[in-house]
Each structure stands twice: as C-alpha cells, then as structure tokens.
Amino acid sequence: MKKHLLVGLLAATLCVMVIACNNKQDMSTRTKFPWVANVTAPRNYPVEVKYGFVGFGQGQKYPIMSSFANAGIGISKGEVSFADLDGEGLAMPNRLEVLWLSYTERKFYKADIAFSEKLQARILSLFQEGYENEQKHENYSCFLVTLLPGGKIWLYLNGIARYSLVCDTLQADAIDMALGDFDKDALLVDSTVEDYCKGNLNKEQVANLKENGVPYELWSKYQERFNYDIEFEFEDNLCKIDSFHFAKHFINGEFNYACDGVKVGELSRPKQLYLKWNVADTTYTGEFFFDEQEVLDMFSKGFSHKTANVRGTFMVKVSKYNNRFDIYLQVGDYKYYLKNSQIDVFKVTPENEKDNDHLFYWNYEGEEVRKYIGA
C-alpha cells in the first residue's frame, strides 16, 4: 500500500513539474500579452493630452483616453481598457504618438516615435519573465507613458506591486499651436495659452511653481542609477524580517517588493521603504520616508569617490527596542548619514491587536509627509 502511495505521489509531483515547465516554456515563447495604455505626469507639473496612441503589431493603435494627467511619475490611475485581460492579449508596444500641453511651461509638445528593436525586445522580455507577488506569479498589465517638462518621455510597465521603468530617453519636440487648434472649447474659458494654463493649476501647483520653477535638471537626477543594495540590520538578534512585506519605492517612480524574484541591477535613489519584522509574537511595521535633497546629495557624494565602482550599501540600523534608527549610505570606507527622514513604526501584539491605533514611534510633527518636487 505504501509503495503504491509513493508511486502515486511521485507521479503527481512529476505531473506538476511538467506543467510548471510547460507554463514557463509557453511564457518564454509568447509574444502577446494583455495590457492597457495610460498616461501620467508629475504631481506638480500637470499636462493636458490632445491625443495619444500606443502603436502595436502591424500598424494597430491603442488610444490613451486620459486627457488630464498629474498622478505622479510612474503612477497609473484610471486607465480605460479595451483589452481582454483574460484573453490572448496584444502584440508588444512599438510606437508612440502623443501631443500635449504642459501647463507649467505654457508649451506644446509632440512626439511620433518608433521604438528601437532593443526597446521592443526589452518590453517583450519583461512581459515574458513577469515577477512573483506573495508566492503567486504576476505579470505587467499597464504600459504607462509619463510626460515630463522639457518634452522628456519615460515609459513604464506597471503591474500589481511592481512598477518598472523601461525607457527614459525619449524626447518630444516643442511646437507652436493656437489654443483653439489644441482644444476649440478652451477658447470658451480663456483667450490665450498662458491664461488657460494658469487657470488649470491648483493652489499647490501654483505655490510650487513660484518656489521651484521648472527644475529641468531634477529629472536628470531622478534618472541616475547606482551600484548599491538596501539592507536592514537589527540590534535584536531575535528580529525576523517578513520578506513578503519589504517594499521599495524609488525616486524615478519604480516600485517593487524584495521577494518578487526579479534580478537586481543598479538602482535609482530610494524614496520610501516599507518593512514588517517580527520579534516573537510582536509585529512591527515601519514606514521610512526620505528627504529629497538629502537623498540627492548623499548619492552624488557617495559615488563621486574613486571607490564609486564598489557596490554600496544603503543601511537602516534598528535599535534593540525598535525605536531608534540610523540610516546611511556606505560606499567603501565612506558613510553618509540621513538626518531628516520621516519615520512611522506600528506595533501589534496579542494584547493590542484589536485596538484601532497601533502607532508606536514617529519622529515628526503632524501627519504630512514631505512630497518630492518632481515626483
């Protein structure tokens, strides 16, 4: 009886392995996937899109239906889907046509760009590879076009719990256009492009524009990548990291969980980290928000030395009682500390798990987290 049971288990295991291998093989040869197209722009630098199309296949076009965009770089909201997300899907994006008005610059930009073979191959490869999310294989579902000041265009593949920047080198052309040609209804509101743009900015955006202008070089900083790892070190040896709840949000808009199985190369500067860790039956959840200027300066200094080709470490050291934090970048023998990070830590124990408030530690006044200028 045991022998027959063992044979049955081996057969079942072999069957699962064959199915898994076939699924992997099918994915690696697949050239169509379900995806939708969307557009976004930095929160402080909104745009209005006259038209947008993502080309795919043999001259086919996927329309971008959103007209107003400022959800933030790398962030997709409110996309309209024409794809069957459970079906065969669409061929890979291979072209972009878009015309938009930048409210903060009072400028029109136009692009009609055929993607290089290299970019198309990268997009296909990412779809074929997918990623892991809490032990479940996921795939990207959104092709996101991010429109930046100066006519820069960044392209992302977004999915559940992962945003990947696939191209940050596309450039649109500034063009002259009459307001009525852009949108005839706009003339019912204002007679000039300048007045129309001013009227479409909210109070926050107006205040930011007055203080910071349009810092074109800032997005060049956001693009930069560095050779480093992100690590947590605990003074209490009993602390155990919950690898399924270790999330990283970067200054270039990328977002991922540490356990997603995607090979890590060079990284953008960190913007925010989220981590759960356990000590016996107590669970801590930490949210770490880094100051924009500090992070910009830290990495510029840290990787300016001769040791810049050495892999660095962005370290968060946690005290024995989980209420003190040292955060620094180490490259070779050099350490650069962050002093202005905003930190929240929540603590859940068997005794307080039914309580509404689990806030255990915070180091700043009020509830407002500082926002990045160009994000």
Language-model segments: residues:
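Low-complexity, Pro/Ser/Thr- and charge-rich linker/hinge segments at domain boundaries
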Residues: 115-155, 296-313
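Tryptophan-paired
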Residues: 54-102, 239-290
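C-terminal motif of bacterial Sec signal peptides marking the signal peptidase cleavage site
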Residues: 17-20
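Activation corresponds to long, low-complexity, non-globular regions
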Residues: 137-243, 247, 310-375
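Bacterial signal peptide processing site
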Residues: 22-24
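Structural motif
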Residues: 38-48, 232-240
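Edge beta-strands of extracellular beta-sandwich domains
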Residues: 108-114, 283-293
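Bacterial N-terminal signal peptides that target proteins for export
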Residues: 1-8
